[in-house]
Amino acid sequence: MRIGFNLPQFGSHAHHPEGVAEFARRAEEMGADSLWVGDRLLAPLEPEVNYPGTTAFPAEFRAGLDPFAALTVAAVVTTRPLLGSSVLVAPWYAPPLLARSLATIDQLSGGRVIAGLGAGWSPEEFRAVGVPMGERGSRFDECLDALAAYWGTNPVEHHGRFWTTAAGYVDVKPVQRPGPPVYLAAFTPAGMTRVGRRADGFLPAVTPGPFEPTIVTGPMSRIRAAAARAGRDPHELGVILRVNTMAGDSVHGIAEVVLRARDEAAVDHAFVDLTYRDLATSVEHAVDLAGRVLDLVRAR
């Protein structure tokens, strides 16, 4: 089973950006299989929608390092772990810029990027970037089309409802061909259908507490059915599980969630956000927790 960790990107860690390189190096030395970033712009004072699975907007999202910059740092100080996003909010970005950033990081890392993308959910953040939230689904679909075009063969060309690219040359391509694997987060029937039709895999998440296998198996059943309807092999789709934590969670409890996901939901790749809700108070603390989680999971 592959085990990874979020980079120290949010909350108090954002005020110590040197910790990104330090954690990435030390996580690789301990044998971590992947390193991850998220994508948040602000923490609204009076949110219209709270963070999924909670009744509040986590305070750590008041400060967040740029995900592309954090992944770039991790790319240049490591050689082995996969580098993923969970998730980049695809509708916020012009596809040519998103394609270029991910292709560049894939080049810098020697082909280790996992492009984890989502449709987004915070109305305040959509307004901040000037993108109508009601268009997020259609923009997301078109973004996937445009990424495939930009990462494909020259000449690159795209004509859509929101973006148009005249035929031209884009010679910086991802190392991975035809592009980095694309994993999508999904919470709605339409989102799960999109995963089945278009993605390489699914990015579910679990919040602190006992692990319930149907959090993974239920959506994956619907996703694989959508893949079959689209003429794809349902069993080719992967699952990478995000495990959120919070202050007070025990290392044994975190490891138990990962192990139950492996044994009861056939999850073969999971990553733990040790900085979510202030579980790890420093990079040194995060490194210690990561090492202990790795030891417990790999012992079983």
Please provide the spans of the model-predicted regions.
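Active-site-adjacent structural elements that line small-molecule/cofactor binding pockets in enzymes
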Residues: M1-R300
